[in-house]
Amino acid sequence: MFGFGEAKEHRDAVYEDKHEGKLSHEVLAGGAAFEAMKLFEDRQRKNGEPVKHAFAKEVLMGLAGAEVDKLVETKGLDYIDREKAKRHAEKQAEHLYQEQYGDMDEYNPERRGRHEATDY
């Protein structure tokens, strides 16, 4: 699993770079997981409500899978094993969440700021 720094690099490679060659499912999954974490953070901080870890992880896994689908379709990545990339993205998203909030009782936007890598 990747930490925030490497996951952010994967996100940038997938979402911003004009890739000439083929992306691996690991890079795609890492980028999708990072973007899912960013989307989750943005939404939860806007709402300002604490949520249980199980719910947060469930939401993140759904967002990560949706991001993989979106990327495969919009970037013409038909050669990617979509289901493998989704599973990897879900695990990576859970890992990022655990790294940032796993030591807390629940996700509470009032108790801890977002990871600095997601400030863009």
Q: What annotation goes with each model-predicted range?
A:
Residues 1-27, 35-57, 67-120:
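N-terminal leader-region detector that preferentially activates on the first domain or presequence
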